Amino acid sequence: MKKNFRVKREKDFKAIFKEGTSFANRKFVVYQLENQKNHFRVGLSVSKKLGNAVTRNQIKRRIRHIIQNAKGSLVEDVDFVVIARKGVETLGYAEMEKNLLHVLKLSKIYREGNGSEKETKVD
């Protein structure tokens, strides 16, 4: 994911937390705030309580990959921060994807069928 799709500055994180709305499930919390750009931006937060640096970086890579795959179905004019909760470090990729997309659907950031997802025909 390119750097212009990321929330990096502390003031941006603080604004999203202070002025934005939050949605959560057991594994993730998502804060969102509308922006004036023509693309979404995402910030990631993984606590040191979830494991060592290797584990935390693996979680962040997986979250980035899930968001990259869902990019075409994400609302464009929003900044959001994904916070990983305790227990996410034990999830496999498929379960993590299911949980993250669930909370993104709750927040109306993710809309199914909007993007470049390929449909497979079953005969």
Curated annotation (Swiss-Prot):
Tell me which Gene Ontology terms the entry assigns under biological process: tRNA 3'-end processing; tRNA 5'-leader removal
Q: What's its EC?
A: 3.1.26.5
A GO cellular component annotation here is: ribonuclease P complex
* Alphabetical UniProt keywords: Endonuclease, Hydrolase, Nuclease, RNA-binding, tRNA processing
GO molecular function terms listed in the Swiss-Prot or TrEMBL record: 3'-tRNA processing endoribonuclease activity; ribonuclease P activity; tRNA binding
**SUPFAM superfamilies recorded for this chain?**
Ribosomal protein S5 domain 2-like (SSF54211)
Q: Which reaction does it catalyse?
A: Endonucleolytic cleavage of RNA, removing 5'-extranucleotides from tRNA precursor
Q: What class of enzyme is it?
A: hydrolase
Q: Where is the signal peptide?
A: none
Query: Subunit notes for this chain?
Result: Consists of a catalytic RNA component (M1 or rnpB) and a protein subunit.
Q: Which HAMAP family match?
A: RNase_P
Query: Function, please?
Result: RNaseP catalyzes the removal of the 5'-leader sequence from pre-tRNA to produce the mature 5'-terminus. It can also cleave other RNA substrates such as 4.5S RNA. The protein component plays an auxiliary but essential role in vivo by binding to the 5'-leader sequence and broadening the substrate specificity of the ribozyme.
What NCBIfam families has UniProt attached to this entry? rnpA
Record family assignment: Belongs to the RnpA family.
Q: What is this protein called?
A: Ribonuclease P protein component
Species: Streptococcus pneumoniae (strain ATCC BAA-255 / R6)
